[in-house]
Amino acid sequence: MAEHLAAVLGTGQTKYVAKRTDVSMSGLVREAIDRALADSGSTFDDIDAVVVGKAPDFFEGVMMPELFMADAMGATGKPLIRVHTAGSVGGSTGVVAASLVKSGKYRRVLAVAWEKQSESNAMWALSIPVPFTKPVGAGAGGYFAPHVRACLLYTSPSPRDRS
């Protein structure tokens, strides 16, 4: 069986700001897709499948947004796969898209990883509910800090490095 190679043909990003009130979730994603397609010299007709990577749904306050955004992503009538790995979702989306090409199943796959966290309360979304943990409401930084410190305690070469 011949090995199929996978490559990134183009990229597209949107403006990084605290809030984009000028566009919807679909509009934000479409901006990035249009830029990626232009960068690659491709059109939606060239795309065989779409892989969408997005963190947990409660960050935007909408369940399964990839379904109502299918038209904006050029995925109508094409295979649409959702990747959900939270903090590593961007990298995981690329891996899934590359795997689909390398398998020989599809020739061109559009990989889209996105978040528009200004749509909901990200601090609430990152806080694990009681009774599973203490109600600190500290978000990702506050949640992971004790884990990082514990890792440093066991892996740092000297006591000075552990503080």
Feature map (PLM): residue ranges:
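Condensing-enzyme catalytic core mediating Claisen C-C bond formation in acyl metabolism
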Residues: 1-26, 127-130, 153
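Conserved catalytic cysteine-centered active-site region
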Residues: 2-4, 54-112, 116-143
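Short, well-ordered amphipathic alpha-helical segments that serve as non-catalytic structural scaffolds
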Residues: 26-40, 65, 93, 144-151
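Phosphate/pyrophosphate-binding loops at sites that engage ATP/ADP/AMP, CoA/4′-phosphopantetheine
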Residues: 34-47, 156
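Residues at alpha-helix termini
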Residues: 38-39, 72, 103, 153
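Short glycine-rich phosphate-binding loop at a beta-alpha junction
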Residues: 48-53
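Conserved small/polar residues in nucleotide/adenosyl-binding loops
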Residues: 154-161
